[in-house]
Amino acid sequence: MSLAEFDADVVINAQNCIVGRVASEVAQRALGGETVAIVNVEDAVITGSEEDVMSVYETRSELGSDQGPAYPSRPDGIFKRAVRGMLPYKSDRGREALSNVRTYVGNPYDDDGEAIDGTTLDRLSNIKFLSLGEVSANLGATVTW
């Protein structure tokens, strides 16, 4: 399905927002039947020290064999995988909800998107974080953003 065919009910800007908090809100909206587009996912952040965050993602990407499980290394794939983890994706209802979610590096829409209350980075006292773009670059993804 191309961008022209995906008419999103809601466009969410993930710039400087915490990945898990945005993903949980997106999962709830998708289960409610809305089509959701998330833009600027490369600028979404994961809290924690660089060593802790990278050890988790490096372990995930190294697990499995050539046949799987495969873990994404691009920021849009990592974000969509986080949303998938919050959905019952093995049921028809969850698969339908996941098909109503699109993630984008950059912003292909004319609309800047809305920021969800309570998900921005300025609510934290912890200053240790990594953006999804930095995580992807450290995992070896080709940087195109």
Swiss-Prot record:
GO terms for cellular component: cytosolic large ribosomal subunit. Keywords: Ribonucleoprotein, Ribosomal protein. GO terms for biological process: negative regulation of translation; translation. GO terms for molecular function: mRNA binding; structural constituent of ribosome. InterPro entries: Ribosomal_uL13 (IPR005822), Ribosomal_uL13_bac-type (IPR005823), Ribosomal_uL13_euk/arc (IPR005755), Ribosomal_uL13_sf (IPR036899). The keyword Chloroplast does not apply. Pfam families: Ribosomal_L13. HAMAP family: Ribosomal_uL13. This protein is one of the early assembly proteins of the 50S ribosomal subunit, although it is not seen to bind rRNA by itself. It is important during the early stages of 50S assembly. Belongs to the universal ribosomal protein uL13 family. Part of the 50S ribosomal subunit. NCBIfam families: L13_A_E, PRK06394.1. This is Large ribosomal subunit protein uL13. The lineage of its organism: Archaea, Methanobacteriati, Methanobacteriota, Stenosarchaea group, Halobacteria. The gene is rpl13.
